[in-house]
Amino acid sequence: MSNAPKLPPRPVASGFGQLPLEADRPAILVTNDDGYEAGGLIALINALRGLGRIIVCAPDSPRSGYSASFTSSRPINLSLVSDDGEVAVYFCNGTPVDCVKIALHRFFHERKPDLILSGINHGGNDSVCVMYSGTMGAVLEGCAVGISSIGFSLLNLSPMADFTHVMPIARRITEQVLANPTPRGVGLNVNIPDVAEPKGIRICRQADGYWESEYHYIEGDEQSDMSWFQVTGTYINNEPEATDTDRYWLEHDYVSIVPTTIDQTAYRHFEQFDYLVK
């Protein structure tokens, strides 16, 4: 169980205004895809205290698997939870990308945040999971507008996961990236094994894999004639012998860091498609 204290209950009123952002103090925007009351988010907030002005804008409820989607079909509401002068917490009824877009639009008119952080996710976002991840969708949104962005994920899906050992790792990486911003368009996908003492940190590439038999069909019974599909599935590693991937290092109890880019161009395969223009 997380040792981080709970955030205040849902507010009875909404409200927000311009927030003071001192020029000599780092400004950090924080979001997630598990919702503003998730233990991983609370742990990340506590890990960051003292590093600068922290603006949290997170979904009002879990939005796992929303990737880089945003809301265009309905209005989005923004509500203030608390602001103690160091950490301001808001939630909205949108996706993680909505949270980033709204926060940038509403709170960062005069200056961009120095850093966007997403997480700490309850569950891993290694290999192909990065494609579906709302945690990493928020990171890529930050990359698109030229802001150094990091996604943190713990390989533990439990809502009661213990983030005690993750907090110092997240703080250390945050401090280092504040001092050495990432190149434009590049974010970091950080996955942490669920062990008390990870063996170290490795910069690596994303593993090549996919999910098989993702949906299980459940037939209706005498209590309910409704049938449905339940998300499930088995991860298939296309390169189980590879020793330079995030999946490999996580299985060996190392923290994996994959530099991730919004540019999905397959540069190595340009010549392979010359026949299309001849």
List the model feature ranges, each with a label.
Residues 31, 57-59, 118-121, 152-153, ...:
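Short beta-strand segments
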Residues 115:
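Short, Asp-centered acidic motifs that coordinate Mg2+ and/or phosphate
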Residues 164-278:
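Electrostatically charged, flexible surface regions
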Residues 124-133:
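Glycine/threonine-rich flexible loop motifs
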Residues 138-142:
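Hydrophobic/aromatic ligand-binding patch that stacks against planar heteroaromatic rings
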Residues 3-28, 38-106, 112:
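A cross-family phosphate/adenosyl-ligand binding-site feature
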Residues 34, 62, 95-96, 121-124, ...:
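Short glycine-rich anion-binding loops that position phosphate/pyrophosphate groups of nucleotides
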Residues 143-166:
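Glycine-rich phosphate/pyrophosphate-binding loops
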